[in-house]
């Protein structure tokens, strides 16, 4: 990966990444790796400590092969930690050379694919490298201030007649692109400033979806994330995994690793084709990029019923991205930070009528393509009752466990999902 940010030759004589956990655990970790047959890795790692870039990259490649030697759940934790170690060695060498882009790329791969042992070293190193990189470019403080750059989603015109015209055209467009019968059945109820007691009584316990409005205004993300200059400043050089293709059920679907700035550029210019959109989907971005994590707040609703947060994921993509009909095992709040989405929901008791896949890996996904229903193959699906809504910017949707849902972005969209369960639900799921 080519570094976007590099220090001049005279600026990096004293650049060093402190890695206290790696320093303390290195010998023990190498012994554990050797015990699993990783003798060649251990030899390369020793050379990497001395600054041998080829050896550091060779060790990283060896660990990468182990990560892809079988199903992810079967990979030994020691090899995940080995990959983190190698990424740190590669990053240290690039950082010492003032190659900040390459260093950040290596650290991000460690955060995305590595184990937990060296995670603090990875995070702390990202902060230090990012700080040095910002000295060479526009500062974060400037980008966080008075935003005047390009917006991801244009502001609505203030002229009343123009607003009506835009809304009328938007409604016609939406109806053309949405699945058959959209917005004709029961709409998901919207509640403004819903109390925790009301949420528990009326929606959580009965297991009923609800759209909650006026509960995200205090999030810094509500203003910051609509500005490309801010997103590029805090995360532009970071490496993220993206999906390319219509959706994960299609044969041509694939994954790529790109810098966040390249991903934003694809969204902004709509360079990906409608059949191959680029989507940053269900990625724990906020475990990786702390600055973006600081821009959001965990809704208090996620702690109702003695709940514990299970995962926190980002869903960033252009208009037209689709998550096909599926269900999840946990309570879910989907917070719409930028843009808008159409969401259709079916209750869990309609599982048989929605024809789930029999394969274990896809058993939570429906064979029914709502965008093109085959009535001959799936005769029960066409007439099923459902609930749906258009989730507007600044709104949150509560989706109960096991409720089937289909999601389509109507504009460029940045969303955050919060999954949570109580102890009893976690043990049974």
Curated annotation (Swiss-Prot):
GO terms for biological process: abscisic acid-activated signaling pathway; brassinosteroid mediated signaling pathway; callus formation; circadian rhythm; epigenetic regulation of gene expression; flower development; negative regulation of gene expression, epigenetic; primary root development. The keyword Iron applies. Fe cation binds at residues 326, 328, 405. GO terms for cellular component: cytoplasm; endoplasmic reticulum; euchromatin; nucleus. GO terms for molecular function: DNA-binding transcription factor activity; histone H3K27me2/H3K27me3 demethylase activity; histone H3K27me3 reader activity; histone H3K36 methyltransferase activity; histone H3K36me/H3K36me2 demethylase activity; histone H3K36me2/H3K36me3 demethylase activity; histone H3K9me2/H3K9me3 demethylase activity; metal ion binding. It catalyses: N(6),N(6),N(6)-trimethyl-L-lysyl(36)-[histone H3] + 2 2-oxoglutarate + 2 O2 = N(6)-methyl-L-lysyl(36)-[histone H3] + 2 formaldehyde + 2 succinate + 2 CO2; N(6),N(6),N(6)-trimethyl-L-lysyl(27)-[histone H3] + 2 2-oxoglutarate + 2 O2 = N(6)-methyl-L-lysyl(27)-[histone H3] + 2 formaldehyde + 2 succinate + 2 CO2; N(6),N(6)-dimethyl-L-lysyl(36)-[histone H3] + 2 2-oxoglutarate + 2 O2 = L-lysyl(36)-[histone H3] + 2 formaldehyde + 2 succinate + 2 CO2. Its EC number is 1.14.11.27, 1.14.11.68, 1.14.11.69. It is an enzyme of class 1 (oxidoreductase). Induction: Circadian-regulation with a broad peak in the late day and early night. Stabilized at elevated temperatures (at protein level). Induced by abscisic acid (ABA) specifically during the post-germination stage in an ABI3-dependent manner. Repressed by brassinosteroids (BR) during the post-germination stage. Disulfide bonds: none annotated. It is found in: Nucleus; Cytoplasm; Endoplasmic reticulum. Disruption phenotype: Altered overall H3K36me3 modifications. No visible phenotype under normal growth conditions, but mutant plants have a short-period circadian phenotype. Defective temperature compensation leading to shorter circadian period at increasing temperatures with altered expression levels of clock genes at 27 degrees Celsius. Reduced callus formation from somatic cells associated with low Lateral organ Boundaries-Domain (LBD) transcript levels (e.g. Its cofactor is Fe(2+). SUPFAM superfamilies: Clavaminate synthase-like. Keywords: Abscisic acid signaling pathway, Brassinosteroid signaling pathway, Cytoplasm, Dioxygenase, Endoplasmic reticulum, Flowering, Iron, Metal-binding, Nucleus, Oxidoreductase. Binds 1 Fe(2+) ion per subunit. Residues 272-429 form the JmjC domain. Interacts with EFM. Binds to ATXR2, ARF7 and ARF19. Belongs to the JARID1 histone demethylase family. Plants over-expressing JMJD5 show delayed flowering. PANTHER family: HYPOXIA-INDUCIBLE FACTOR 1 ALPHA INHIBITOR-RELATED, HYPOXIA-INDUCIBLE FACTOR 1-ALPHA INHIBITOR. Histone demethylase that demethylates 'Lys-36' (H3K36me) of histone H3 with a specific activity for H3K36me3 and H3K36me2. Also active on 'Lys-27' (H3K27me) of histone H3 with a specific activity for H3K27me3 and H3K27me2. No activity on H3K36me1 and H3K27me1. Involved in the control of flowering time by demethylating H3K36me2 at the FT locus and repressing its expression. This is Lysine-specific demethylase JMJ30. It comes from Arabidopsis thaliana (Mouse-ear cress). The lineage of its organism: Eukaryota, Viridiplantae, Streptophyta, Embryophyta, Tracheophyta. The gene is JMJ30.
